[in-house]
From Swiss-Prot:
Belongs to the IspH family. The keyword DNA-binding does not apply. [4Fe-4S] cluster binds at residues 37, 121, 219. Its cofactor is [4Fe-4S] cluster. Binds 1 [4Fe-4S] cluster per subunit. GO terms for biological process: dimethylallyl diphosphate biosynthetic process; isopentenyl diphosphate biosynthetic process, methylerythritol 4-phosphate pathway; terpenoid biosynthetic process. This is 4-hydroxy-3-methylbut-2-enyl diphosphate reductase. Pathway: Isoprenoid biosynthesis; dimethylallyl diphosphate biosynthesis; dimethylallyl diphosphate from (2E)-4-hydroxy-3-methylbutenyl diphosphate: step 1/1; Isoprenoid biosynthesis; isopentenyl diphosphate biosynthesis via DXP pathway; isopentenyl diphosphate from 1-deoxy-D-xylulose 5-phosphate: step 6/6. Dimethylallyl diphosphate binds at residues 66, 99, 149, 247-249, 292. The keyword Manganese does not apply. It is an enzyme of class 1 (oxidoreductase).
Length: 336
């Protein structure tokens, strides 16, 4: 999955090179890891392989991943994004996004004789399985997540009679359970680790017998990207997070950067959205990207910053990621 390695907070380009005096030179600290996680890579490749196999158009329910560039690029290749399976012609191919869907969505697709390809991230599927398991055991399930997010809707849909959404620490006082000895918390996979733990702490103060999920629900990539940002933020006058505004994990990175000591932090989809006014008086800029962001967008920001004198790019490496997920069975061939 990923492994922690010695932290290099960007003082040198690589082992053995000279150090840089941060007081006299502009520099960029580049977070590693950043960008695509295994689930996003799998989801995007699923759509690409479906196009190769079935030809355009193919349909995708919701955005395959929460990134504007990815969605626009796939749309240009013949992918049609819809909000509901009712918009898909009967018998057509439809891909379910990385965020997962409820059983009701599967049933609606079957009723329309749709050929479904499920690109749900396996780590989201794990949370679905946990929800079903604890619902069978008649637990009250407190699902920590953001109201309206597709992942939350899909997970809650696995056991709607047992799941209660808890949208952050401030929502804890509104929670009601049937039996305080049969309560478990689960979470959306893309949340802030710190805020989630604060929510859990407050839940446990109310319900001392609250059970933890069998394993972490916040995914490895979300955690790794937040750790890298925390490592570099105290040195940064500015942190730029490349990602879309509807990307939960990207938005969380901005929050994490500010909470960890960055003087300013902004979210951008493209280099052209970087306001030159942000750079005034700034010597150290941190760069990272959300888990659904292709590296070409980060490179665009780095090129733009180089034009403004930030040519010295130094890595902040906190983990190595090696996890790869298999494609859906119907699309499996040799991976590219």
């Amino acid at each position: 999955m990923s492994s922690a390695i010695p932290l290099n907070v960007g003082i040198a380009r690589s082992a053995g090179t000279a150090t840089v005096d941060a007081d006299t030179a502009k520099r960029v600290l580049l977070a590693e890891p950043r960008g695509y996680c295994a689930g996003v890579d799998r989801a995007v490749e699923t759509v690409e392989k479906a196009l190769e196999k079935h030809g355009a158009p193919i349909y995708v329910r919701k955005e395959i991943v929460h990134n504007r560039h990815v969605v626009e690029t796939l749309r240009e290749r013949g992918v049609v994004f819809v909000d509901d399976t009712a918009e898909v012609p009967e018998g057509a191919v439809v891909v379910f996004s990385a965020h997962g869907v409820s059983p009701a969505v599967h049933e609606a697709a079957a009723a329309r004789n749709l050929h479904t390809i499920d690109a749900t991230c396996p780590l989201v599927t794990k949370v679905h399985q946990e929800a079903k398991r604890f619902a069978r055991d008649d637990y009250d399930i407190l699902l920590i997540g953001h109201e309206g997010h597709e992942e939350v809707e899909g997970t809650a849909g696995e056991a709607p009679e047992h799941v209660q959404l808890v949208d952050g620490p401030d929502a804890v006082d509104r929670v009601r359970v049937r039996d305080e000895n049969k309560v478990i918390w689960l979470s959306q996979t893309t949340l802030s680790v710190d805020e989630t733990m604060e929510t859990v702490q407050r839940l446990r103060e109310r319900f001392p017998s609250l059970q933890d999920p069998p394993s972490d629900d916040i995914c490895y990539a979300t955690q790794n990207r937040q750790v890298a940002v925390k490592a570099m933020a105290p040195e940064c006058d500015l942190v730029i997070v490349v990602g879309s505004r509807n990307s939960s994990n990207s938005v969380r990175l901005v929050e994490v950067a500010l909470n960890a000591g960055a003087k300013a932090a902004h979210l951008v989809d493209y280099a052209r959205e970087v306001d030159p006014a942000w750079l005034e008086g700034v010597r150290t800029i941190g760069i990272t990207s959300g888990a659904s962001v292709p590296e070409i967008l980060v490179r665009g920001v780095l090129d733009m910053l180089a034009e403004h004198g930030y040519a010295d790019v130094q890595p902040v490496t906190t983990a190595n990621e090696t996890l790869v997920f298999a494609l859906p069975r119907e699309l499996r061939t040799t991976r590219r």
